[in-house]
Amino acid sequence: MNWTRTVLDGFAMAAYFNLFAGLVALYKPRLMFPCYPPAIIKAAKDPPTGVENRFYWLWICFGELLPLLLYGAVSTMEGGTTGFWPLALTGYIQWMMVNFCDLFFLDFWLIQRKAKSRFIIPGTEGHPGYGFNAWMKDYALPEHLLQWPFLMCPILAAAQAGLGLLIDIFW
């Protein structure tokens, strides 16, 4: 396992994920509405439409996760890492880096500090769920300390390792 490449690829993946997500949310916060805390979604005068939900999931799957899975698998294989478990460990480390950069860059710095007013969904202004403590306690920390490390990262790491093995077989 190439540790330097793993860390650098993790930062590259985190940069792509966070910059793309941040730009989309800054452009039009409603596009990210399905990933807002449930209390804010329920309080909205206009809840997310089917088209918005569909766009969000297509964008997350094909605009965010799939390119990162491909990049992670190809880069790891090109770095000389082979075998399912080394590939999965590399993928897990990279996805955890994406996770923690998402927590610190998007949830903590950008949404709660730097550009808070730009992330407010029209019709939910003044909702207590946008407060720092509520956002972190009810949404960001459970997502980034429970959901990502124990569900998302293992699934994405296994998918990335499997993709790496397929690349090794057919490339």
Language-model segments: which ranges?
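Membrane-interface helix-boundary motifs at transmembrane edges
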Residues: 46-52, 77-84
